[in-house]
From Swiss-Prot:
Residues 1-24 are annotated as: Disordered. This is Casparian strip membrane protein 1. The chain crosses the membrane at residues 49-69, 99-119, 139-159, 185-205. NCBIfam families: A_tha_TIGR01569. The keyword Transmembrane helix applies.
Amino acid sequence: MEGESTAVNITETPKERKGKAPLLAPPPASGGIKTIVQKAPKGGYKRGLAVFDVVLRIAGIAAALGAVIAMGSTDQTLPFFTQFFQFKAEFDDLPVFTFFVIANAITAAYLALSIPISIVCIIRPHLVGPRVLLTFLDTVMVGLTTAAAGGAASIVYLAHNGNSDANWPAICQQFNDFCQEVSGAVVASFITVVVLMFLIVLSAFSL
């Protein structure tokens, strides 16, 4: 009959299906893709160490100045005296204590002057020269401050305990305030030594 059409369904065989190309191309092999990894900029941890370095230097200044003030202001006069003698103790009676004050003052001044160099290391963490300079100078200050603190500590020990073999009596029973002040100054100086040692370790890690 006219106007009518007949639809005929043709079933494909498996062989004919294999011969046809796939509609979607397979994804390319993973080996052909180049992965671009953007590396984080270096120097982040070095900048953090440099900031901590500045904080430690400020703490070292406080400890060194505390040692200088405590030792430099040490002065005690006993309330009794004789016709010819007045019993008085001052830090400059002993050259070791005088050296102690000078050495810790030098250390405090150095730490203050080294802060701008340490700030440069914060701004430019990759610079090696300033860090090497600070490491060298910190090591010198460790030696100076340790010598001053060790010498003063030996005198403080004798002041507290005396020495029976040398017939040196302990004086801290009479000059109690004097001994307390010089002992505090020695402790502050050793704290400065510890701070300087930490600064050397930080500088070594920052190189």
